[in-house]
Curated annotation (Swiss-Prot):
This is Phosphomethylpyrimidine synthase. It comes from the Bacteria. It comes from Desulforudis audaxviator (strain MP104C). Its EC number is 4.1.99.17. [4Fe-4S] cluster binds at residues 409, 412, 416. InterPro entries: ThiC, ThiC/Bza_core_dom, ThiC/BzaA/B. The gene is thiC. Zn(2+) binds at residues 269, 333. Pfam families: ThiC_Rad_SAM (PF01964). Keywords: 4Fe-4S, Iron, Iron-sulfur, Lyase, Metal-binding, S-adenosyl-L-methionine, Thiamine biosynthesis, Zinc. Binds 1 [4Fe-4S] cluster per subunit. The cluster is coordinated with 3 cysteines and an exchangeable S-adenosyl-L-methionine.
Length: 432
């Protein structure tokens, strides 16, 4: 069932009920949000094993994990392990960004084994197939691009990243203004090369209605990609980025008119003092459409630690109203992430999202922290580990560093503040 069309008719779908249960909400606000386009439930009608996830206003901040093969590393076994680790770490959605090996097989395996929404970037496969077929990405034919879109929709992909805002107009803005890092979006660069070589408009923009027909038929949500996202602090919030956002705002209107669910992607690399303004600008220009941000990374000098730079920016962005955070791993800017990089990226991004949910008073967020505080007050280590966002790491640290199972920890030892104050105040440990 098409989620937005059902919501317009006042029909509550099983997916809406699932989202309401998971969020601790009555179903009516979810129904209203889907109808208005401020909540998106990516759920391809052909998916059989999907646990519906809601993204948008009033809901818990969601986290996406990117996985995928590359031309240098295309082993499916690694891919499967990374998927399992991302899910175990708590990812709410997964994107298959594969560019190496059998792309159809890789995607179909993920869809068959992944219970959460799965997204793709169709231009990747279209570009790679054009290179294999003709020897050059710029030789890609427009019909072949849309054939890939429909093939992936038929497979059950729940949302597409589509760089429809990379237009001849936005490229002209970029060329006139100049940029330090130009275009860092891979999908945006594929389309830019094709457009400039062929001197033609972006097919996704020119034939946007054709794209909407496919998405409507399978209820694939559109994630309007930010091909002009800044790739460094110096390029943040420049004319090219804002020009693309203006176009994306117009495309949001067209998606909603057609009954296609839509959310909007955002930067990128952004200084701390510009993040809130970027979120407010997107929400204003895109009429409350859910905002999906990559980071944003708040400095460019921390390769190896970009899961931290992204978590800092992600917390601020989500606090300001961003709804969906794409994880960044420690391997960002350095290479394909390992299994451990994937786990660390998901956990760091979940921490950022939860920190924002505390501010936004998302149901259950403050209660989680309060339960942890009570467990700490009671020196209840098992409960603390159970409540930790990463129980595995918490247990390992505690076991390794407190082998004698002292009531406190090895940081303070017998001078544990919780223990001492409890004794002086005559309080017993409280069970949480």
């Amino acid at each position: 069932m098409n989620q937005m069309l059902a919501a317009w008719q006042g029909t509550v779908t099983p997916e809406m009920e699932q989202v309401a249960r998971d969020e601790g909400y009555p179903v009516e606000p979810v129904l209203q949000g889907v109808a208005a386009g401020t909540i998106v439930i990516p759920a391809n009608m052909r998916r059989k094993n999907l646990k519906a996830v809601g993204i948008g206003t009033g809901l818990r901040t969601k986290v996406n994990a990117n996985i995928g093969t590359s031309p240098k590393q295309s082993a499916l076994d690694d891919h499967r392990v990374k998927l399992r680790v991302a899910l175990d770490a708590g990812a709410d959605a997964v994107m298959d960004l594969s560019t190496g090996g059998d792309l159809d097989r890789c995607r179909r395996e993920i869809l068959a084994s992944c219970p959460v929404p799965v997204g793709t970037v169709p231009i990747y496969q279209a570009a790679i197939e054009a290179k294999e077929r003709y020897g050059a990405i710029v030789a890609m034919r427009e019909d072949e691009l849309f054939e890939v879109v429909e093939r992936q929709a038929k497979d059950g992909v729940d949302f597409f990243t589509i760089h429809a805002g990379v237009t001849l107009e936005s490229l002209d803005r970029l060329r006139k203004q100049g940029r330090l890092t130009d275009i860092v979006s891979r999908g945006g660069s594929f389309l830019t090369g094709w457009m400039l070589h062929n001197d033609r408009e972006n097919p996704f923009y020119k034939e946007f209605d054709r794209l909407l027909e496919i998405c409507l038929a399978y209820d694939v949500a559109l994630s309007l990609g930010d091909g002009m996202r800044p790739g460094c602090q110096a390029d943040a919030t420049d004319r090219a980025q804002v020009q693309e956002l203006l176009i994306l705002g117009e495309l949001v209107d067209r998606c909603r008119e057609a009954g296609v669910q839509v959310f909007v992607e955002g930067p990128g690399h952004v200084p701390l003092d510009q993040i809130i303004m970027n979120v407010q600008l997107q929400k204003r220009l895109c009429k409350g459409a859910p905002f999906y941000v990559l980071g944003p990374l708040v400095t460019d000098v921390a390769p190896g630690y970009d899961h931290i730079t992204a978590a800092i920016g992600g917390a601020v962005a989500a606090m300001a109203g961003a709804d969906f955070l794409c994880y960044v791993t420690p391997a960002e800017h350095l290479g394909l992430p390992t299994v451990e990089d994937v786990r660390e990226g998901v956990i760091a991004t979940r921490i950022a999202g939860h920190a924002a949910d505390l501010v936004k008073r998302v149901p259950g967020a403050r209660e989680w922290d309060e339960r942890m505080s009570r467990a700490r007050k009671a020196l209840d280590w098992e409960k603390q580990i159970e409540l930790a966002i990463d129980p595995e790491k918490a247990r390992r640290y505690h076991t390794e560093r407190n082998p004698e199972k002292f009531a406190g920890c090895t940081m303070c030892g017998e001078f544990c503040a919780m223990k001492l104050v409890g004794e002086y105040l005559g309080k017993d440990y409280e069970n949480c």
